[in-house]
Structure formats: structure tokens, C-alpha cells
């Protein structure tokens, strides 16, 4: 079953609860830059997020260089944002908690 695309009001409400996530200019995706102490922490984060993504059957677009992981979330089947994007964003924030140095949060 295809996830339902969220309207602008629902997206704004969800983003209000999410720290650091930014709505793309086109309104079709959200993104966040995560920074960690080192590569091992970044890779550990990505591994934990990959397992969560598999459970949700919803997968991020991400880019990793050393301690940096840039994430973009969108639901391509809905041509925009759905609840799945915000569920995965919350899981990613949980996975990052405790791994990110305070000065990088």
C-alpha cells in the first residue's frame, strides 16, 4: 500500500518536533547533517539506522565522509514526505544520541 503524502501543515507540525531537520526548498524531502567523533561512530550510526530502515522498509539517501553523515529523507512512491520519513528521522535521532559530541549537536 502506498503511503499517504503529508500536506504542508502536517509537515510543519512534524518538523516542529524534530531538532535539526530541515525542509528542502521544494518541500518534498527533509535533510540533516550528523557529525560524530570519528569514522567508527559514524559507521556505527549508519549500521543502526540501516537496521531501522529495513524494519520500516523505508531507506534513506545518505552520504558519508569520515565522521560526517548527511541524510535526505523522502518517500518516492508518494512524491513527497510521509509519516515514514518522520518515523525514520526519529529513529536516526535516537541512534545519534550519545554518539555526537555536544559541540556538534
From Swiss-Prot:
It holds the Pfam family Pterin_4a. CDD domains: PCD_DCoH_subfamily_b. SUPFAM superfamilies: PCD-like. Its EC number is 4.2.1.96. This is Putative pterin-4-alpha-carbinolamine dehydratase. GO terms for molecular function: 4-alpha-hydroxytetrahydrobiopterin dehydratase activity. The keyword tRNA-binding does not apply. NCBIfam families: PRK00823.1-2, PRK00823.1-3. Belongs to the pterin-4-alpha-carbinolamine dehydratase family. PANTHER family: PTERIN-4-ALPHA-CARBINOLAMINE DEHYDRATASE (PTHR12599:SF0). Keywords: Lyase. One of its GO terms (biological process) is tetrahydrobiopterin biosynthetic process. InterPro entries: PCD_sf, Pterin_deHydtase. Disulfide bonds: none annotated. The keyword Lyase applies. It catalyses: (4aS,6R)-4a-hydroxy-L-erythro-5,6,7,8-tetrahydrobiopterin = (6R)-L-erythro-6,7-dihydrobiopterin + H2O.
